[in-house]
Amino acid sequence: MSISLRCAAALLLTGILLNGCGNSEGSADIRVLNVSIDYSTVDLYLDNGTTNTPTITGTTYGTLTPYKGVSGGAYTVEFTNNGVQSSLKSLSENLAARTSKTYVSYGDIGGFGFLEILENQDPPDSGYTMVQIIDAAPDAGSVDVYLTDPAATLADSSPTFSGVAGGVVGSGFLTITDGTYRLRVTGAGNQSDIRLDSVTGTSFSNQEILSIVLGGTRGGVLVNATVIPQQGTATPITNPYARVRAVAGIPSGSNLSASLSGSTLLTSAAANTVSSYSLVQAGTAQLNLTLNNGALTPTSQTLNPGWDYTILVLNGSSVAGTTTTLLADDNRLPTSSTYAKISLVNAMSSLGDPVTLNVNYTPEANAVALGNSSATSQVTAGTADTEIDTVDATTSTTLFSNIQATLTGNGVYDLFMFGSAAAPVAALHINRQQ
């Protein structure tokens, strides 16, 4: 058996359209695939030095447009937000007549980019397929890509593409036997760090030339994929999983167990415990909790594919009974390695007041209510020289202060505040570091 993919798993990158095959006599044919979550609708302009023309407009997230034929020549290719003329990013290049290209737009706010796929490759010999990886998911960090027999285990497999970096067309084409392949993506060098699994496999046809585009997700760690045959119709592979962890905001001396759709998150965990993330099937999931050896009524949680979540369980003097809150986590990386990201989670179940987070005397999260988390803030990274303080937003009382905290570059952190005003507990938790 060999290596391939195309009709894979679930489709969340909805609306991937058909695209007529190129190309018109004397023209260059271009199209756009948009995999940017933050820039969910984009326009492509072509500037020939005389006029700046909106050429492909209104490309929504997950959509591959039909080809647009343009006169061959030198252009500035420019992307903008839909309906806005200010440039997100531009590139000067020559669009040669009788050639075809797909532009892939991607990125977060402040980190927009686009890559291009050249679609005039000669086909491989009969019985083979050519495959390349286009990594438009820089937030995922460096990844390994496996194309295997659908039944093969990762432990018995080697990466087809190793250490693929985000934001580059870096893999080059690999010629493989045609057939059905299971696509799996892991963190580089770590087979247990699953980022995508197409499970059943995708068919790679005889003499096909395929580009597999990896796209980012809302959580930042998992990825989606889109398989694009040269000058053909795209097939999306939507991640079937979410990543979920649980947090025990319970009184000292208590213990909590938590499972979600059969995945164990906590086992007799002490107060103030933060579990690791686990992969859980997206959709409706049943949450089962046991507090101090007593089972609580199960609840249903709705998980979006590709998202990261925290299930915050609270029990204490400021809470009526036991509450659970599903918090969406933003674990996308900072814009550069000189920065870190941080958010505040208010789990002070025996206080009840909102809490404010200051980093180097600057408020980064204001009056976060009990049972909630703040938006993620980007701050300057530092080693043993960052001051982090939390304050009771009602009384202005300092709850926690660390004048020698370390926030590592490219790290994503949560500061969990537990306990009461008399006995506050702070836990600075690193969610990921690239």
What are these regions (language model features)?
Residues 1-19:
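Sec-dependent bacterial lipoprotein signal peptides
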Residues 21-434:
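Intrinsically disordered, low-complexity polar regions and short flexible loop motifs
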